[in-house]
Amino acid sequence: MAQHGALETLKDLAEKEVDDAARLLGEMRRGCQQAEEQLKMLIDYQNEYRSNLNTDMGNGIASNRWINYQQFIQTLEKAIEQHRLQLTQWTQKVDLALKSWREKKQRLQAWQTLQDRQTAAALLAENRMDQKKMDEFAQRAAMRKPE
């Protein structure tokens, strides 16, 4: 029974690890999604700003305003590049969290399999014991029966 309790405890710990890994994976995916949304917003803003620049250039633009546009676009490009790096980092975090979750899930399944085998072995032993008792009872009953 102590072994059964130990297996149960190990399986419970593995379940907790799987739950914790799933929570972490969810957090990493949310972070990655937010980084994707921020990057998209920056790219959209950059495209809109460039469109405004093209419109203003078509209508004529002062050189100092054109310089301001260029500087701001360069700043946006740097921000976009930084967000791309952040997105890459978030993607790596998601991949690691997913790998960890899969490993923990596999470990849990191994513990579950061991527990199932142990339960089946205990049931088989119990059935054999019952069969042995029934055979002994039948044998004693046959010996008492007068012929």
Curated annotation (Swiss-Prot):
InterPro entries (alphabetical): Flag_assembly_chemotaxis_eff, Flag_FliJ_proteobac, Flagell_FliJ, FliJ
GO annotation (BP), single: chemotaxis
Membrane association type: Peripheral membrane protein
Keywords of the record: Bacterial flagellum biogenesis, Bacterial flagellum protein export, Cell membrane, Chemotaxis, Membrane, Protein transport, Transport
A Pfam family: FliJ
Domain of life: Bacteria
GO annotations of cellular component type: bacterial-type flagellum; plasma membrane
Location of this chain's protein in the cell: Cell membrane
Main location: membrane
Keyword presence, Membrane: yes
Gene3D superfamilies: 1.10.287.1700
Gene Ontology molecular function, alphabetical: cytoskeletal motor activity
Signal sequence region: none
Transmembrane stretches, start-end: none
Function: Flagellar protein that affects chemotactic events.
Family: Belongs to the FliJ family.
Name recorded for this polypeptide: Flagellar FliJ protein
Organism of derivation: Salmonella typhimurium (strain LT2 / SGSC1412 / ATCC 700720)
Gene behind the chain: fliJ
